């Protein structure tokens, strides 16, 4: 996703197929971007050099207060030296509906399904003590409620339940987000403050019984979990506090503090990549299958400031510092038998981004 030469990012045909309640409905076929809700499960991944796209068909109707989308697609995999092509082993589809009871308020209900025909899912151990890799078919039911009341009270809630088949196991997994905040509209710098708790299930006993690791599908991985690009919405618990300030009409700043833990000590710490780039939704960053490394990932501070220079130009500056917890100091990375404290240090991220829109 960091290197991709000249290619077709979007290439589709769109046809008006219906007119309902004075609003048209369309069928779009071809290569296209998709973004729904808070981008926890489906996102264009705007942070990466190559935005995420899908090949397939999507029918949608958007009205005054209600939107409905239905789609069947395959994720496009960036190719450095060849034209990008969809992953023919993955079929991803679903239905996403949104109701807006008032301005700035959203209620979503959705069903998503991902099917991978490749033997990439590590399932349960067989009688020969070999972990069986197989295909997977995962369905997700979810709901989201987000918005504000009179530009003061803020809320953001989302819950997701997953079920299906994972290699030679069945899946029962879930995730939720609870967020409450308040916006001080008439105070200097218009500050707003949030408290969030994010949870995504992990497998309590990997390789045995039921598969319990949540699959984050195709998320905006960078935007969540301290924006340090190390953690995904799988086997994780994140209590975080956020503050936003509008220093001037064109300068916005955000500060975050995160307390991060694994949900299951025996399951892995997963990255933010998404199902199109990692077979399990997120690449395994570290794992202690004994559970002795514990669950303390660490704490992270993050700051960003956006300068909106004009209608077309923005400059974004950000910094994050991860204070490594005991888990990072003790759990090995894939291919390592063990890890020493000297190998696991605090992590930092600093970035400057210029964007031009036309």
Where in the sequence are the language-model features?
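Flexible internal linker/loop segments at domain or repeat junctions
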Residues: 212-233, 264-291
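Signature for the C-terminal beta-barrel architecture of outer-membrane proteins
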Residues: 17, 21-27, 41-207, 246, ...
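C-terminal beta-signal and adjacent terminal beta-strands/loops
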Residues: 308-339
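Membrane helical hairpin/interfacial module
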Residues: 1-9, 14
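Hydrophobic, well-ordered secondary-structure elements that form the walls
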Residues: 195, 241-243, 255, 303-305, ...
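Small/polar (Gly/Ser/Thr/Ala-rich) solvent-exposed segments
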Residues: 30
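Outer-membrane beta-barrel "beta-signal"
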Residues: 344-358
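Outer-membrane beta-barrel signature, preferentially recognizing the C-terminal barrel domain
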Residues: 89-92, 134, 221-246
């Amino acid at each position: 996703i960091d290197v991709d030469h000249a290619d077709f990012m979007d290439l589709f045909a769109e046809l008006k197929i219906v007119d309902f309640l004075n609003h048209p409905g369309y069928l779009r076929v071809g290569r296209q971007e998709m973004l729904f809700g808070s981008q926890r499960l489906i996102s264009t991944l705007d942070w990466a050099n190559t935005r995420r796209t899908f090949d397939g068909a999507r029918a949608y109707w958007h009205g005054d207060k209600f939107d409905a989308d239905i789609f069947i697609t395959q994720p496009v995999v960036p190719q450095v030296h060849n034209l990008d092509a969809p992953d023919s082993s993955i079929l991803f589809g679903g239905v996403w509906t949104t109701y807006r009871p008032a301005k700035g308020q959203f209620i979503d209900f959705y069903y998503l399904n991902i099917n991978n025909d490749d033997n990439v899912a590590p399932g349960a151990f067989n009688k020969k003590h070999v972990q069986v890799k197989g295909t997977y078919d995962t369905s997700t039911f979810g709901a989201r409620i987000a918005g504000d009341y009179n530009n003061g009270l803020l809320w953001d809630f989302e819950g997701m339940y997953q079920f299906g088949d994972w290699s030679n196991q069945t899946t029962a997994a879930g995730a939720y987000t609870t967020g409450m905040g308040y916006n001080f509209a008439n105070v200097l710098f218009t500050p707003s403050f949030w408290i969030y708790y994010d949870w995504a299930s992990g497998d309590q006993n990997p390789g045995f019984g039921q598969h319990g690791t949540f699959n984050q599908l195709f998320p905006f991985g960078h935007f969540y979990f301290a924006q340090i690009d190390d953690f995904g919405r799988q086997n994780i618990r994140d209590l975080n506090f956020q503050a936003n300030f509008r220093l001037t009409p064109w300068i916005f700043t955000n500060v975050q503090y995160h307390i991060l833990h694994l949900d299951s000590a025996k399951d892995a710490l997963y990255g933010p990549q998404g199902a199109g780039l990692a077979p399990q939704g997120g690449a395994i960053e570290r794992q202690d299958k004994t559970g002795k490394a514990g669950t303390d990932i660490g704490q992270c501070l993050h700051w960003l400031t956006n300068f909106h220079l004009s209608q077309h130009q923005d400059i974004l500056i950000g910094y994050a510092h991860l204070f490594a917890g005991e888990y990072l100091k003790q759990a090995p990375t894939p291919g390592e038998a063990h890890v020493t404290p000297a190998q696991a240090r605090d992590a930092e991220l600093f970035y400057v981004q210029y964007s031009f829109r036309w």
